[in-house]
Each structure stands twice: as structure tokens, then as C-alpha cells.
């Protein structure tokens, strides 16, 4: 974990500080989500972006077809960037809630707003790169520390069941 003494010097040098990208290698962000959760959540998100933020539509398509992305909903960034991101994000999420709700989903799957926000953070950030708002040289990636550990056997087994037998995730690992 990063300490205050380690972080403070980075704040002047970097506009955005993130956990290292998660790499899926054999799947795109969209296909991984489709196998492990419910793809209609991303499809409706795409519709909302096309309606409310059409200038982000191509970036959305580009991002969901990548095999890596910034996950975990963790970021440190300049206040003006964070304000812009949150305004954009919550406008989309509140509309997503209106359209989908959480009925008929178990408690684990009801957390899909957080999962969708992980993916669309990458859309927002990529668009900031494209528009020259954020310089990639002023982005810092830091290693991820799992304080609770990860059961890789259960995680791997659940992934294979999702990919080959359409068994959606039921919990975290």
C-alpha cells in the first residue's frame, strides 16, 4: 500500500494515478463481462452513451473491444478532472438505473453499476487522451495489493464455467 510520503511527490508530477491495468489476454472487456455477468447492462450503457454523449460512442466501442482496462474503481486525479468524470459517470449510471433497475437480480449481481463504471471509466479516460485533456505522460500506474488474498482456483474455475457453460458469477473470489 502506498504511504502519504510516497504519494505526495506524485501529486505534482501526475494528473491521474491508477492501479495497473488488468489484462484479460483471451477475452475483450465486453466478452469477459458477457460471460461472467449480463451483457444487456453494457448494451444499454452503450445506448445511453450514444444518446447523451454521442462524441463518446466510438471510444466506447474501441474500449470494450480491448483486452485490458483500469478496474477496481480506484483513481486519484486532479479535482477538475474528477468533477468532470463524476458528472459524466453519474449521469449515465442514473439513466441506467431508470432503464434496468435491479429487480430479479441477486445481491451479487445488483452490484453491476460498479462493474459498468469500471469499464466506462476507461471510455472517459481514453476520450480525455484523444481530446488532449489528459497527457498519457502524466498518468501513473501503481501495483495492486490484495489485502484479503484471491482464491485463484475458485476464480479460475468460475471463469471457465462462465466462458464455456454460461454460468454467471455468483460471488467474488
Predicted regions and their residues:
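ER/Golgi luminal nucleotide-sugar-dependent glycosyltransferases, focusing on the catalytic module
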Residues: 1-173
Amino acid at each position: 500500500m502506498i504511504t502519504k510520503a510516497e504519494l505526495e511527490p506524485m501529486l505534482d508530477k501526475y494528473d491521474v494515478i491508477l492501479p495497473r491495468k488488468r489484462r484479460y489476454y483471451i477475452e475483450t472487456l465486453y466478452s469477459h463481462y458477457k460471460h461472467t455477468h449480463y451483457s444487456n447492462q453494457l448494451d444499454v450503457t452503450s445506448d445511453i452513451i450514444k444518446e447523451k454523449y454521442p462524441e463518446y460512442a466510438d471510444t466506447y466501442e474501441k474500449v470494450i473491444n480491448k483486452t485490458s482496462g483500469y478496474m477496481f474503481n480506484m483513481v486519484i486525479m486532479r479535482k477538475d478532472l474528477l468533477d468532470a468524470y463524476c458528472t459524466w459517470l453519474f449521469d449515465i449510471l442514473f439513466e441506467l438505473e431508470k432503464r434496468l433497475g435491479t429487480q430479479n437480480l441477486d445481491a451479487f449481481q445488483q452490484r453491476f453499476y460498479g462493474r459498468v463504471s469500471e469499464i466506462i471509466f476507461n471510455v472517459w479516460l481514453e476520450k480525455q487522451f484523444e481530446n488532449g485533456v489528459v497527457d498519457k505522460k502524466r498518468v501513473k500506474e501503481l501495483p495492486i495489493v490484495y489485502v484479503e488474498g484471491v482464491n485463484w482456483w475458485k476464480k479460475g474455475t468460475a471463469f471457465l464455467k462462465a466462458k464455456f457453460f454460461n454460468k454467471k458469477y455468483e460471488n467474488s473470489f
